[in-house]
């Protein structure tokens, strides 16, 4: 007898549904003052749906305190998800601050700085030296 395998597409669909539901639940159900305005960026599920890495950004507040508060509320959020999702296993939630935006801004700054240094060096090379 063969076991029924879940398709990778199903994993993505469930992760997307968890992302949508968590966004709503955090906004409406979690009353922790350490959690400001939070955006759930993505959810990564393990193949057996036992664990989910939830990546978020915080528009307001300290990201570390927000992460701590979200992980503290993860049990409550897990129970609320269990009532909404119609799947056998609702994953244990692990919240992680998504630093992608900060890294992109820093990378852009470094590129801009490198380009301006390069342009300055090119200008100095093109300018003839003055004879004293």
UniProtKB/Swiss-Prot annotation:
A molecular-function term among this protein's GO annotations: ribosomal small subunit binding
The keyword ATP-binding belongs to this UniProt entry's keyword annotation: no
InterPro entries found in the cross-reference section: KH_dom-like_a/b (IPR015946), RbfA (IPR000238), RbfA_dom_sf (IPR023799)
Residue ranges, annotated region (Disordered): 113-132
Pfam families xrefs: RBFA
Compartments where found: Cytoplasm
Keywords for the protein's UniProt record, in alphabetical order: Cytoplasm, Ribosome biogenesis
TM ranges: none
One of the GO biological process terms: maturation of SSU-rRNA
Cysteines joined through disulfide linkages: none
GO cellular component terms given for this protein: cytosol
Primary location: cytoplasm
Keyword Nucleus: no
Similarity-based family: Belongs to the RbfA family.
Subunit structure: Monomer. Binds 30S ribosomal subunits, but not 50S ribosomal subunits or 70S ribosomes.
HAMAP family: RbfA
Function: One of several proteins that assist in the late maturation steps of the functional core of the 30S ribosomal subunit. Associates with free 30S ribosomal subunits (but not with 30S subunits that are part of 70S ribosomes or polysomes). Required for efficient processing of 16S rRNA. May interact with the 5'-terminal helix region of 16S rRNA.
Name the UniProt record assigns to this protein: Ribosome-binding factor A
Naturally occurring in which organism (per UniProt): Burkholderia cenocepacia (strain HI2424)
Taxonomic lineage: Bacteria, Pseudomonadati, Pseudomonadota, Betaproteobacteria, Burkholderiales
Gene: rbfA
């Amino acid at each position: 007898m063969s076991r029924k395998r879940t398709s990778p597409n199903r994993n993505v669909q469930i992760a997307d549904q968890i992302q949508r539901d968590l966004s709503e639940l955090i906004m409406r159900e979690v009353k922790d003052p350490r959690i400001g305005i939070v955006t759930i960026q993505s959810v990564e599920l393990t193949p057996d749906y036992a664990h989910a890495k939830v990546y978020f950004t915080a528009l307001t507040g300290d990201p570390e305190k927000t992460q701590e508060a979200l992980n503290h509320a993860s049990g409550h959020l897990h129970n609320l998800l269990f009532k909404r999702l119609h799947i056998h296993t609702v994953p244990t939630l692990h919240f992680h601050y998504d630093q992608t935006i900060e890294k992109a801004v820093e990378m852009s700054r470094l590129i801009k700085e490198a380009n301006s240094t390069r342009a300055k060096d090119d200008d100095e090379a093109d300018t003839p030296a003055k004879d004293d």
